């Protein structure tokens, strides 16, 4: 499934004293199976952009083409597009409303006019994907769960729609480290096992470096950087100029290099740093 964004522009409160251009002539192509991280300072246009991809917002100019269908046209059935493109908002647990977890997850599939058998199959699959045991949790109230578990239920409700593209807006916001790691692990598995296209909005450069295959940097409504994590995080000066940064481990490794250690400064994850440091220690041990 391909997504093409052509000359996309969106203006809030147009023709008023409070007019603000949130998206400014953005051009992108998202290919099937990519894991894209969308980063940028608050107000850079990230959330506005993803709401256009899902069809929740209409642009003032430009086009969004999903599988050769221009979704900005009035005659397009957006319900069909949203079957393909799922969106998980920030703090999605606040949108839970049913009396049981099973009913909450079933809400989306029921609106697809599926058979009861297919709905039950999707509920079980979605709960399994997010790490919730079906028999244990199906009849529980979602409001009895921890914050991390509520987040999983909310994500399962979108996953049960079986979208080809899953967009997540800060899915780990407000979670403790354990809950955060579990959610990210489940998102990684979705991408790996089902070849699902993932668009992840995140403020964590560490998570982005570890998970994404491509990084888009937004600033004042424009996409100013677009590339693999190694390419984007090498642009430290550009990132810092727009209020962002490279992963902390990158600064650490560059500092060690400045102090005379013979190491690569192009390190962006803890795992990469571990391998690089072990290589140095092993070389020193061999030379002793």
From Swiss-Prot:
Q: Which GO terms describe its cellular component?
A: ATP-binding cassette (ABC) transporter complex
Keyword Hydrolase in annotation? no
Query: Pfam families annotated for this entry?
Result: ABC_tran
Q: Which Gene3D superfamilies match?
A: P-loop containing nucleotide triphosphate hydrolases (3.40.50.300)
Q: Where is the major localization of this protein? A: membrane
Superkingdom as given in the UniProt entry = Bacteria
* Residue span(s) of domain ABC transporter: 3-245
The residues forming the signal peptide are none
At the top of the EC hierarchy, this enzyme's class is translocase
* Mode of membrane association: Peripheral membrane protein
Q: Which UniProt keywords apply?
A: ATP-binding, Cell membrane, Membrane, Nucleotide-binding, Translocase, Transport
Q: In which residues is ATP bound?
A: 40-47
Q: Which InterPro entries match?
A: AAA+_ATPase, ABC_transporter-like_ATP-bd, ABC_transporter-like_CS, ABC_transpr_CbiO/EcfA_su, ECF_ABC_transporter_ATP-bd, EcfA2, P-loop_NTPase
Q: What is its EC number?
A: 7.-.-.-
Q: Does the keyword Translocase apply?
A: yes
Indicate the family of this protein.
Belongs to the ABC transporter superfamily. Energy-coupling factor EcfA family.
Q: Whom does it interact with, and what assembly results?
A: Forms a stable energy-coupling factor (ECF) transporter complex composed of 2 membrane-embedded substrate-binding proteins (S component), 2 ATP-binding proteins (A component) and 2 transmembrane proteins (T component).
Q: Which NCBIfam families match?
A: ECF_ATPase_2 (TIGR04521), PRK13637.1 (NF010158)
Q: Function, please?
A: ATP-binding (A) component of a common energy-coupling factor (ECF) ABC-transporter complex. Unlike classic ABC transporters this ECF transporter provides the energy necessary to transport a number of different substrates.
Its protein name is Energy-coupling factor transporter ATP-binding protein EcfA2
This protein's species is Clostridium tetani (strain Massachusetts / E88)
Phylogenetic classification of the source organism = Bacteria, Bacillati, Bacillota, Clostridia, Eubacteriales
């Amino acid at each position: 499934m391909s997504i093409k964004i052509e000359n996309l522009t969106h203006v809030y409160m147009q023709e008023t004293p409070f007019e603000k251009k949130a998206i400014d002539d953005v051009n992108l192509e998202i290919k099937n199976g990519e894991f894209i991280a969308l980063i940028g300072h608050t107000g850079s246009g990230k959330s506005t952009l993803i709401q256009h991809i899902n069809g929740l917002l209409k642009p003032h100019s430009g086009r969004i083409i999903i599988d050769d269908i221009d979704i900005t046209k009035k005659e397009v059935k957006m319900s069909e597009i949203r079957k393909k493109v799922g969106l998980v908002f920030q703090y999605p647990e606040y949108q839970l409303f049913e009396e049981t977890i099973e009913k909450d997850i079933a809400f989306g599939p029921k609106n697809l006019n599926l058979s009861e058998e297919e709905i039950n199959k999707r509920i079980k699959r979605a709960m399994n994907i997010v790490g919730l045991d079906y028999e244990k949790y199906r009849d529980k109230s979602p409001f009895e769960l921890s914050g991390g578990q509520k987040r999983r239920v909310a994500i399962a409700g979108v996953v049960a729609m079986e979208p080809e593209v899953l967009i997540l807006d800060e899915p780990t916001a407000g979670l403790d480290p354990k809950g955060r790691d579990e959610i990210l692990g489940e998102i990684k598995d979705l991408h790996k096992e089902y070849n699902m296209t993932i668009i992840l909005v995140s403020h964590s450069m560490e998570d982005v470096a570890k998970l994404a295959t491509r990084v888009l940097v937004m600033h004042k409504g424009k996409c100013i950087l677009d590339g693999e994590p190694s390419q984007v995080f090498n642009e430290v000066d550009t990132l810092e100029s727009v209020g962002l940064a490279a992963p902390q481990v990158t600064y650490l490794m560059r500092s060690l290099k400045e102090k005379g250690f013979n190491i690569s400064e192009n390190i962006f994850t803890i795992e990469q740093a571990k391998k690089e440091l072990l290589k140095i220690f092993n070389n020193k041990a061999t030379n002793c």
